[in-house]
């Protein structure tokens, strides 16, 4: 991975942590994205007293199909053969569901 890609990923992780915190969700970046510390994920968020390990991916156009399917819906469920289903939703909607908006 090139430096510009790492920088882009780091910026996104910092932005996500700030958004989580704005919704009252305790969150922090995992040092070195967990590579050196043996942790999975890029971010740890505390939700209902439990650690949620969150992986963050940023792509220029890599998720067009997902955005197209999600358009106008609150959430999208995707499933590959012999895999568990995944739910995709706008970040702010997720934060509204699990966080507490600061006033």
Language model features with spans:
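Catalytic phosphate/metal-binding cores of nucleic-acid and nucleotide-processing enzymes, i.e., regions
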Residues: 1-103
């Amino acid at each position: 991975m090139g430096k510009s890609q790492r920088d882009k990923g780091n910026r996104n992780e910092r932005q996500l942590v700030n958004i989580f915190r704005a919704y009252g969700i305790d969150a922090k970046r995992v040092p070195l994205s967990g590579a050196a510390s043996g942790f999975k994920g890029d971010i740890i968020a505390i939700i209902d007293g439990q650690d949620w390990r969150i992986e963050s991916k940023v792509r220029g156009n890599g998720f067009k199909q997902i955005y197209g399917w999600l358009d106008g819906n609150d959430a999208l469920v995707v499933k590959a053969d012999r895999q568990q289903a995944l739910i995709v939703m706008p970040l702010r909607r997720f934060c509204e569901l699990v966080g507490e908006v600061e006033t």
